[in-house]
């Protein structure tokens, strides 16, 4: 069996960063975006975290994490270091 190398295909995704505080314009924008895509499948925690129902189960996005909307339309959290190593800004949605 041969080990092959693969490069991730370029795909444009949408993403938003979980803000440090609830009740801010940024938090309101995130809430609206997630409600449009997930409806009742999103929960906001008192500590500012967001829980998202995904195909793999409920996943938590802490403040400072990113929430990604994949090419297939699924939402999932991503830690900042992984996000910045994987994605670059290409423009506004």
Where are the regions a protein language model picked out?
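Short, compact, well-ordered microdomains
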Residues: 54-93
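N-terminal domain-onset segments
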Residues: 1-55
């Amino acid at each position: 069996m041969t080990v092959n190398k693969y490069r991730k295909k370029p795909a444009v995704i949408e993403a938003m960063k979980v803000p440090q505080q609830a009740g801010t314009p940024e938090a309101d924008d995130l809430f609206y975006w997630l409600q449009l895509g997930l409806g009742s499948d999103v929960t906001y925690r008192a500590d500012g975290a967001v829980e998202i129902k995904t195909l793999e189960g409920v996943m938590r996005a802490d403040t400072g994490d990113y929430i990604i909307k994949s090419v297939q339309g699924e939402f999932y959290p991503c830690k900042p270091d992984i996000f910045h190593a994987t994605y670059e800004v290409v423009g506004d949605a």
